[in-house]
Amino acid sequence: MKFDVTITIALKEGMLDPEARAIRHALANLGFATGDLSTARLFRISIDAEDTAAAREEARAICERLLANPVIHRYTIEVE
């Protein structure tokens, strides 16, 4: 079966996020009042697998081996 998988990767709490800092500064310059702001990367992948659990495991392996650095990133996986 084919499963649509969404992977969201973000920095762990306490990690510096210079992109978010620049965006927050730009928003303030444009007159927008913002509080906390963080960035994340979203990947949508179509995975062929036997079931939802296998698709989730494949996505986890993709994160661990390529997309995420476990020292600085956290990730979530959604399987449809």
Positions of predicted regions on the chain:
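Long, contiguous binding/interaction regions
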Residues: 1-80
